C-alpha cells in the first residue's frame, strides 16, 4: 500500500504543475454559498446559491493547495478530464461549535461560502471534512455549469474601497481586506485611521515586515446604522452591518459573527485572499478561523496584540499555544497529530519542527530559564495542559507577555505569504 500511495503522489505532482489558469478559468470569481447543519456527531452541507463576483484576485499560479491545513478542503475538478484544477483548505465556525457542550443536544445551521476562479467549462465541486484520525471524507458535491442562468450577477452591496498598503497586482500578492463593523457613516474617518494603525502594527512584525512588498491591504467603507457591537451578556444590542457579537459560544471575549454571507458581500468590494473584520468597540475581544475570517476589537489596550495574534490563526492556521481553556472540549485527540503547524501530540512529530531543534535539547523540554529562547517541545498547548506540545516557552500565540511569533510560526506564515504572492 505504501508503494501505491507514493506512486500516486509522484504521478499527481506533474499534473498539478501543468495546471494553467487560462486553460480552465476566466478572470473573475465564482462564489458558492451553502448551509452547514448538524450537531456534535453529524453534519450535512446543503447548497444555497452561486454568485458571480469581480476579477479573480488569488494566485493564478498556485491553484492547488499544498498545505492541507484546515478541517475541510474544497476541490474543483474539470468535469471533462476529471483533473483537479483548484483546491483550498479551510476551517469554519460550525466546526468550532461542534466541539462545544451545546452541540451534544442541539442541532444548528451555519452559513458557509467558498470562492474559486470562474470556470470556462463544467466543473464538479466537492467538500471533504477531516475526521479525528486525519482522514478526509466527502460530505458535499455539486456539478456547476458556467452557463447556468441561476448564477447571480446583480450587485446589491456596493461600497467604496481604498488602498491601505499597496505593493502591486492582486494576483501576485497576499491581499488582505479590512472591513468595518459598528462604524457609522460619520465614523468612516476613524475607520481609515484604525486601518492605518493596525496595518502598521502587522507590517512591523516578522515575517510580515520582511515581506511588505508581497502584501496588499485594502479597506471597504461599509457603514453601520449604529456604533459598536452586540454584548448579549450585558443586554446590549446594536444595529450593525455584520451582526458581530461578544459571547460567541457563551465565551465573553469571543467576538465573531455567524452572518458569513454578509461578510462575503462586503469583502467582495475589494480584492482579497484574507478577510479581517475591525469592530468599533473598546471591549477586549476577537477571534479568527483559518481561511474563514479574522476579527478584533480596535480600541482596547490589547488591540494591537489581538490583531496580530488572530491573523496568525486566520492566515497561517496557527493553533493557540496556551493550555487550561475549557471553551472547547476535546479539540485535539491525543492519538492523532494536529494539522496545525505549531503544536504536536508527538504522534507524527517528524512532520513538524523536529529539524529546527538544536542537538542536546531534551524532548519534552522543561520550562527552565536556559531554554527560554530555544525551540523545543514544551508541554501545554491547544487549550490543554497535558499531551499537546508547543515549540517555545512563549510567543504571541501563547500570551500577552510576548509580541512576536516564534520561529516555527514565522516559517509557517512565510510559506503561506509566498504561496499567495507567486
Q: For each predicted feature, which ranges?
A:
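Short pre-active-site segment immediately N-terminal to the catalytic Zn-binding motif
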Residues: 188-191, 286-310
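Active-site-proximal segments of metallohydrolase catalytic domains
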Residues: 214-290
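Active-site recognition of the HExxH zinc-binding catalytic motif
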Residues: 74, 199, 304-321
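Fold-level signature of zinc-dependent metallopeptidase catalytic domains
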Residues: 150-206, 219-229
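Boundary at the C-terminal end of the N-terminal hydrophobic targeting segment
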Residues: 15-17
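Sec-dependent N-terminal signal peptides
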Residues: 3-13
Amino acid at each position: 500500500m505504501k508503494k501505491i500511495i507514493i506512486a500516486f503522489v509522484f504521478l499527481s505532482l506533474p499534473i498539478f504543475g501543468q495546471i494553467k489558469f487560462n486553460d480552465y478559468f476566466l478572470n473573475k470569481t465564482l462564489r458558492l454559498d451553502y448551509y452547514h447543519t448538524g450537531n456534535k456527531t453529524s453534519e450535512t452541507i446543503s447548497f444555497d446559491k452561486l454568485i458571480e463576483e469581480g476579477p479573480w484576485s488569488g494566485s493564478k499560479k498556485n491553484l492547488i493547495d499544498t498545505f492541507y491545513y484546515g478541517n475541510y478542503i474544497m476541490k474543483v475538478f474539470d468535469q471533462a478530464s476529471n483533473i483537479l484544477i483548484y483546491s483550498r483548505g479551510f476551517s469554519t465556525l460550525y466546526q468550532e461549535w461542534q466541539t462545544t457542550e451545546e452541540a451534544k443536544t442541539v442541532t444548528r445551521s451555519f452559513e458557509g461560502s467558498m470562492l474559486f476562479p470562474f470556470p470556462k467549462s463544467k466543473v464538479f465541486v466537492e467538500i471533504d471534512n477531516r475526521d479525528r484520525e486525519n482522514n478526509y471524507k466527502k460530505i458535499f458535491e455539486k456539478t456547476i455549469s458556467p452557463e447556468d442562468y441561476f448564477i447571480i450577477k446583480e450587485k446589491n452591496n456596493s461600497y467604496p474601497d481604498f488602498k491601505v498598503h499597496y505593493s502591486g497586482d492582486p494576483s501576485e500578492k497576499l491581499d488582505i481586506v479590512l472591513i468595518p463593523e459598528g462604524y457609522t457613516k460619520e465614523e468612516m474617518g476613524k475607520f481609515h485611521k484604525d486601518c492605518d494603525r493596525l496595518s502598521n502594527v502587522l507590517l512591523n512584525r516578522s515575517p510580515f515586515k520582511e515581506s511588505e512588498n508581497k502584501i496588499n491591504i485594502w479597506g471597504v467603507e461599509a457603514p453601520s446604522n449604529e456604533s459598536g457591537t452586540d454584548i448579549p451578556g450585558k443586554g446590549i444590542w446594536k444595529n450593525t452591518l455584520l451582526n458581530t457579537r461578544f459571547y460567541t459560544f457563551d465565551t465573553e471575549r469571543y467576538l465573531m459573527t455567524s452572518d458569513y454571507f454578509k461578510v462575503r458581500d462586503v469583502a467582495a468590494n475589494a480584492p482579497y485572499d484574507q478577510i479581517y473584520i475591525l469592530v468599533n468597540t473598546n471591549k477586549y475581544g476577537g477571534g479568527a478561523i483559518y481561511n474563514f475570517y479574522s476579527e478584533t476589537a480596535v480600541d482596547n489596550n490589547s488591540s494591537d496584540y489581538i490583531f496580530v495574534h488572530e491573523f496568525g490563526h486566520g492566515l497561517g492556521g496557527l493553533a493557540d499555544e496556551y493550555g487550561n481553556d475549557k471553551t472547547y472540549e476535546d479539540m485535539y485527540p491525543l492519538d492523532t497529530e494536529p494539522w496545525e503547524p505549531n503544536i504536536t501530540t508527538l504522534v507524527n512529530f517528524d512532520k513538524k519542527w523536529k529539524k529546527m531543534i538544536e542537538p542536546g535539547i531534551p524532548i519534552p523540554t522543561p520550562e527552565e530559564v536556559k531554554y527560554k529562547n530555544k525551540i523545543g517541545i514544551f508541554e501545554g498547548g491547544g487549550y490543554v495542559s497535558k499531551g499537546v506540545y508547543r515549540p517555545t516557552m512563549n510567543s504571541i500565540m501563547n500570551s500577552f507577555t510576548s509580541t512576536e511569533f516564534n520561529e516555527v510560526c514565522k516559517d509557517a506564515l512565510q510559506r503561506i505569504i509566498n504561496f499567495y504572492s507567486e
